Every structure is written in structure tokens, then in C-alpha cells.
């Protein structure tokens, strides 16, 4: 990831949260965020049918989570796989919205075994993953949970995300270390 991106992503997530009228510790309703960004969110089964999605999932598990399309007339559509759990779907949509917010280019479409797939720019995917986490789990919310000693499961339940997503944000954001240092400082009697 490019230098400074993680801090930039936190600020961008905070800015968009403010724009839609949320507190700094409030995770957004992902569809409200999509509407704010002018992105339509569509269930893939409307386009290809559930049987086709299940067939793809059986042929290559996890091959399709979500994808964003920039259509004629300036229309932007995020299509998600309804076969996934709701918490995963929320993360997938947030990931696609992150691509839009960051102005990432549409990936190249390729055919593999009769199925169309997008190739991924690894750096853009990493950035979108990080920003999606910032959108779904604001740093202020992470701090609140870390200082309270709450675990990833409690955070996931509060924010409606998966436990792996909550664990990822807690572990990579630095809030656990910050809370631990704060407790150590208070316990030692130092200011």
C-alpha cells in the first residue's frame, strides 16, 4: 500500500460518515452510503438467476462476491452475490464502494471456462479492502470496544460485520495496542 494511505482512508471514511450525518463512531447503513455515492446496489440473482450463482459457487467457491460496473449515462452499479452471509455481503458492498470512492479503474474482463471474471489490480484491491474496513468499523468505535475490553465477536455483533472483519480491524488498526498502553500507563501511576 502506498505510504500514508491508511491514514488517508481513515480520514476519507470519517468525511463520508459526516456527509451522511453519522457520528464518528457509527457504522453506516451500507445501502445509505451507496445511495449517497450514487451507486445502485443490485442482487446478482436478478441478473443471472440463483441457479447460475450456485453453479458458479460449486465450480469455484468464492469466485464472485461483488463487482462494480460503470454504465452508460454515468450510472454506477454494484452487483453482489446473495449466496454469501449478510455480514459478508455488507463487506463486499463496502469493498465495491471503496473502489468507487478511490476512483479505481474498472478491471479487465476475462473468460475462464465459459465464465466471465474480472482481473484484479492487487494494490487497488488492498486499498479497497482497507477503506472498506474503515467505512464499516470506524476507528472511534474500535477504540470504544478496545478500551472496554470487548472482543472481535462483540464488535462484529454491534456493527453487523463478520467476526474475521472485526478481528482484522482490531488487529491492524493499532487500537488494541493503544488501549493496552493506556491501561499500563494508568496502572503505573504515570500521567
Task: Label the model's feature ranges.
Residues 1-191:
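Active-site hotspot residues in diverse enzymes, especially metal/ion-binding acidic/histidine motifs
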Amino acid at each position: 500500500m502506498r505510504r500514508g494511505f491508511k491514514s488517508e482512508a481513515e480520514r476519507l471514511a470519517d468525511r463520508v460518515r459526516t456527509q451522511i450525518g453519522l457520528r464518528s463512531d457509527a457504522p453506516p447503513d451500507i445501502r445509505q452510503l451507496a445511495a449517497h455515492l450514487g451507486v445502485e446496489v443490485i442482487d446478482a440473482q436478478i441478473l443471472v438467476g440463483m441457479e447460475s450463482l450456485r453453479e458458479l459457487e460449486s465450480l469455484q467457491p468464492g469466485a464472485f462476491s461483488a463487482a462494480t460496473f460503470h454504465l452508460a449515462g454515468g450510472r454506477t452499479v454494484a452487483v453482489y452475490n446473495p449466496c454469501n452471509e449478510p455480514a459478508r455481503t455488507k463487506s463486499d458492498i463496502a469493498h465495491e464502494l471503496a473502489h468507487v470512492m478511490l476512483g479505481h479503474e474498472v478491471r479487465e474482463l476475462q473468460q475462464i471456462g465459459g465464465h466471465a471474471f474480472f482481473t484484479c489490480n492487487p494494490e487497488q484491491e488492498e486499498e479497497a479492502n482497507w477503506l472498506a474496513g474503515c467505512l464499516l468499523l470506524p476507528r472511534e468505535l474500535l477504540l470504544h470496544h478496545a478500551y472496554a475490553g470487548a472482543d472481535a465477536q462483540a464488535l462484529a455483533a454491534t456493527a453487523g460485520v463478520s467476526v474475521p472483519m472485526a478481528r482484522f480491524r482490531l488487529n491492524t488498526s493499532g487500537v488494541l495496542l493503544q488501549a493496552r498502553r493506556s491501561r499500563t500507563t494508568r496502572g503505573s501511576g504515570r500521567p
